């Protein structure tokens, strides 16, 4: 409907299947390749034209997000970005921001791109959007790759050209072993784990990129949203709340003080996001997302804090249309 290729098959690189399995694969082929959120449901759009490998979209990204939202999707996984206009706030970025303003409980997540060698402000649009979560890639320590705990050198750097922090977070994106489409004719990576489809392709292949990092971050976003719904009791968590929770739980990789133009606010960490104190205790949660502020005004809150613990506060908001 929105892609260049009407076929549901992934006959070119297998990129889309690799992303989908990383997010929500059920591990039926090999438990080691279970996705981050294996009980999630999938709404998919074929944006890669398999006969040519060309990427493209038909219609507006606003309409695509609206279609997904109407089919109950609440996390939008976008392991792609536009060529050119790097670092710029484009019409597509504005379109995504407008949709999030209109439908505040869908969280769009975009890869920043793999242009780390080109210097600063190389983030692809729509990751330059203001109401999105823009994801860069971190190392994993997979054998033959750099040690875990750093931003990988191919991950595009921020900030946006108008000075905003990008990426927002990073996630593991090096040497990820995930699903390979049975019909893929030009697999983009080497096979991993064991087992083969009837047609000869391996079940799994290894890929690296901010696309792969976006899949991991999107799975974390889905589980974070589920936690807020089921454990905190907020039936329809806003995109801003999911973003705030993930940023608050992100781990500083230590390359520079956060936030910075390489890792944003740090590497996503599900445990620190939902159980930040000791990994076992569900905290009392206070959320106030109903008030708005005008220039020159403020809101005052008072909390009683255990002196033996610190206080972390993260503010995230969905920009109004006049600021988009």
What is each PLM-predicted segment?
Residues 1-57, 71-76, 83-88, 102-107, ...:
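Subtilisin-like serine protease catalytic core
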Residues 4, 147, 151, 199-206, ...:
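Flexible glycine/proline-enriched surface loops and loop-helix/loop-strand junctions
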Residues 5-11, 190, 198-210:
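Short pre-catalytic strand/loop immediately N-terminal to key active-site residues, enriched for Gly-Thr
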Residues 44, 171, 202-204, 226-307:
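C-terminal subdomain of the subtilisin-like protease fold in secreted/lumenal serine endopeptidases
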Residues 310-320:
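A short beta-strand element within beta-rich, extracytoplasmic domains
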Residues 322-324:
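Conserved small/polar residues in nucleotide/adenosyl-binding loops
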């Amino acid at each position: 409907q929105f892609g260049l290729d009407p076929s549901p098959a992934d006959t070119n690189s297998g990129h889309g299947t690799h992303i989908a399995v990383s997010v929500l694969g059920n591990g039926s082929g090999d438990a080691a390749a279970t996705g981050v959120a294996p009980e999630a449901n999938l709404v998919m759009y074929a944006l890669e034209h398999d006969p040519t490998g060309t990427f493209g979209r038909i219609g507006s990204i606003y309409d695509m997000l609206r279609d997904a939202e109407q089919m109950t999707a609440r996390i939008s996984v976008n392991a792609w970005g536009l060529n050119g206009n790097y670092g710029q706030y484009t019409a597509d970025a504005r379109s995504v921001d407008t949709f999030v303003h209109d439908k505040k409980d869908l969280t769009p997540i975009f890869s920043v791109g793999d242009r780390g060698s080109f210097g600063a402000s190389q983030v692809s649009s729509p990751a330059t959007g203001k109401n999105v979560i823009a994801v860069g890639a971190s190392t994993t320590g997979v054998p033959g790759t750099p040690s875990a705990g750093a931003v990988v050198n191919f991950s595009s750097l921020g900030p946006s050209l108008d000075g905003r922090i990008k990426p927002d977070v990073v996630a593991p994106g090096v040497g990820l072993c995930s699903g390979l489409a049975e019909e893929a004719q030009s697999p983009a990576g080497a096979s991993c784990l064991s087992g083969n489809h009837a047609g000869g392709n391996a079940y799994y292949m290894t890929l690296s990129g901010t696309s792969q990092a976006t899949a991991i971050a999107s799975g974390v976003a889905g589980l974070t949203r589920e936690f807020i719904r089921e454990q905190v009791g907020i039936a329809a968590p806003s995109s801003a709340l999911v973003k705030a929770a993930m940023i608050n739980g992100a781990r500083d990789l230590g390359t520079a003080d956060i936030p910075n133009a390489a890792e944003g606010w740090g590497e996503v960490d599900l445990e620190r996001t939902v159980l930040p104190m000791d990994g076992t205790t569900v905290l009392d949660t206070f959320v106030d997302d109903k008030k708005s502020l005008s220039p020159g005004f403020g809101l005052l809150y008072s909390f009683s804090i255990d002196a033996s613990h610190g206080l972390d506060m993260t503010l995230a908001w969905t920009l109004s249309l006049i600021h988009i």
